[in-house]
Amino acid sequence: MSTHNVFFAAKLGDTHRQRFRQHFLRLNASDLHLRFGSSLNGSAVINYVRGIDCEQDEIYAVTDDAKCILGVAHIVVMEQEAELGLSVLAPARGLGVGNTLFDRAVMRLRNRCVSEVLVRCLHQNAAMMHLAHKHGMEIQHDGTDREARLALPAATSGSHMLEWLQDRQASYIGNLQDGSRLGQSLLSAFPVFGMRPAGKKLVKAGSSR
């Protein structure tokens, strides 16, 4: 009997900085260049993680059964506008991790009454451009840079309820994953609302490839 991976984006905070750092340090030089729009060494990555404002910013992550972070969405909110950066580890690309993170970020921003989300990336970041086109973002060209914007609808009681449900489910599924085999059997047996089975201040340019 085949099983399906179920991806969910869980909110992380200040106590997870070590896991953020481990995630970014697993990206190679090319991945870091696409993610941040410039070349970063290990020290710069550590400084970036140290500088994340977990009180004001929003951080969401998709993890595997071993609690390894497969992908991270870092959202910097600036009043009515927010900037989004995505990164996904190479083995998890093409499975929907980036899309899951994008959807969760948009839902959170909508419910925070943010009117527009912005993504900046290099023109060669084909995966991020694909994600931007897929979600109907308006893309502007500026030399080698691309700037994609998406206007967000106003929050409703329904959008707040959906976010609450997804947060509860993310927590529940995370607890199930701690049981590994039992958790996977339960996830395979029951559909999970809002979750998607696997299918084939320095936030620039998330790499979701």
Regions found by a protein language model. Give the residues of each.
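Terminal substrate-recognition subdomain of acyl/acetyltransferases
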Residues: 1-4, 87, 120-121, 127-209
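A short beta-loop-alpha structural element at the N-terminal edge
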Residues: 6-19
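Acetyl-CoA-dependent GNAT
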Residues: 26, 34-83
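A short, internal acetyl-CoA/4′-phosphopantetheine-binding micro-motif in the GNAT/acyltransferase core
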Residues: 63, 85-94, 122
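A conserved beta-turn-beta hairpin within the catalytic core of GNAT-like acetyltransferases
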Residues: 76-86, 93, 141-144
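Conserved acetyl-CoA-binding loop-helix of GNAT-fold acetyltransferases
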Residues: 88, 94-108, 116, 126-130, ...
